[in-house]
């Protein structure tokens, strides 16, 4: 929850020298989406956002169908993972922002894969990657959830492993969650069974919450974080 009293930037430093920054910012209500986004991104830059260590940008918007084109145009081409979800900010504004920055990256790669996008942050002994699928074909939430994991199977294989071993966290956004959450859970649990994940082994940390994309027929969207 983004609240008025919460800091807009948090920083962590590890004993091994790793440094991370997390931004959590909400626009002030303005005359238009473009005005709000312009002001929000200026605040983000003033706090040091948008530099080479930017890894993730997630925008929470009030109307992704109408706002997606303007958002892409205004933020420009970025070598970061960019996600957009229809989740209106509680203060009446049209846009809010999460951003994750990782210091000390040896490199960063963003590439288009068939059906989606992968961004890698390279470290000395491992790499972090964020992955998200763009396309869908199944008409229901259970089928779309299975499609998400089938696509992720291929991405994990390209990273040199399997979903059960590499994927640590997923964020799943579900349109009309009252009617589609059951299918989400059935599809996800079926995939976890296929991977052999149990309470005795481990499960992939997973958030399933109300949210929509710019595609009206798309009932689910999943962002995934892995370590390879």
What are these regions (language model features)?
Residues 1-228:
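Short, polar/acidic, helix-capping and beta-turn segments at strand->helix junctions
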């Amino acid at each position: 929850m983004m609240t008025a009293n919460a800091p807009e930037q948090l920083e962590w430093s590890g004993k091994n020298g790793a440094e991370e920054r997390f931004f959590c910012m909400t626009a002030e209500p303005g005359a238009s989406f473009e005005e709000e986004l312009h002001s929000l991104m200026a605040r983000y830059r003033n706090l040091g956002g948008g530099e080479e260590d930017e890894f993730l940008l997630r925008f929470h918007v009030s109307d992704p169908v109408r706002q997606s084109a303007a958002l892409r145009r205004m933020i420009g081409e970025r070598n970061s993972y960019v996600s957009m979800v229809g989740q209106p900010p509680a203060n009446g504004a049209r846009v809010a922002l999460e951003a994750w920055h990782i210091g000390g990256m040896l490199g960063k790669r963003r590439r288009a894969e068939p059906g989606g996008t992968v961004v890698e942050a390279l470290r000395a002994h491992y790499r972090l990657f964020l992955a998200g699928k763009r396309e869908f074909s199944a008409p229901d939430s259970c089928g779309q959830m299975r499609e998400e994991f089938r696509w992720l199977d291929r991405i994990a294989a390209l990273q040199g492993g399997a979903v059960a071993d590499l994927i640590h966290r997923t964020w799943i956004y579900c349109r009309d969650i009252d009617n589609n959450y059951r299918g989400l859970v059935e599809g996800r649990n079926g995939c976890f069974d296929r991977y052999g994940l149990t309470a005795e082994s481990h499960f992939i940390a997973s958030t399933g919450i109300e949210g929509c994309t710019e595609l009206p027929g798309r009932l689910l969207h999943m962002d995934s974080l892995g370590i390879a």
